[in-house]
A protein has these predicted regions:
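PRPP-associated nucleotide enzymes
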Residues: 1-175
């Protein structure tokens, strides 16, 4: 299956989880083996010189772990606060109404690691920005950011470009 056909499997659910939201449901894409492979192969094509693949909880894990498997690379889970059992570092980021925190194990990456960072959605850039900060604090270099979906009209891309002008950001779908 080609990438364009795979992306057509994403369905929009209007007014979910609340009125005015157009939720992008990726479960039909995930359920189709050929489509899922097409997406992970496309993501893997951006790996270049990466030594690790990092994924952001929760749906970023799905794609990042599959890409890591395909490339025979390590996978780094970046999780919400309180979900990792060992020593962690954390990074908080702003939300529309409040804040949230991401964590990663202190020994998850080695200094000098080259990280391909994957998430499912790029919206405001807050979550991805926090993940980049975590990688930088551990001495890793984020070589590329990938998102399956980018929400048009939100400042995510501009926010990331302003703060991290040397990190390319690629989204497969902008809606």
């Amino acid at each position: 299956m080609n990438i364009d056909d795979a992306l057509l499997l994403i369905r929009e659910i209007p007014d979910y989880p609340k009125p005015g939201i157009r939720f992008q449901d990726i479960t039909p894409l995930l359920a189709d083996g050929e489509a899922f492979v097409a997406i992970t192969e496309k993501f893997a094509s951006y790996a270049d010189s990466s030594t690790l693949i990092a994924g952001i909880e929760a749906r970023g894990f799905i794609f990042a772990s599959a890409v890591a498997n395909q490339l025979h690379s390590g996978f780094v889970p970046i999780r919400k606060a309180g979900k990792l059992p060992h020593n962690t570092i954390s990074e908080s980021y702003g939300l529309e109404y409040g804040s949230d925190t991401l964590e990663v194990h202190v020994d998850a990456v080695s200094k000098g690691s080259k990280v391909l960072l994957i998430d499912d959605v790029l919206a405001t850039g807050g979550t991805i920005g926090a993940a980049i900060e975590l990688m930088h604090r551990l001495g890793a270099e984020v070589i590329h950011v990938l998102a399956l979906l980018e929400i048009d009209g939100l400042p995510g891309r501009a926010t990331l470009a302003a703060k991290y002008p040397n990190i390319p950001v690629t989204s497969l779908v902008v809606s």
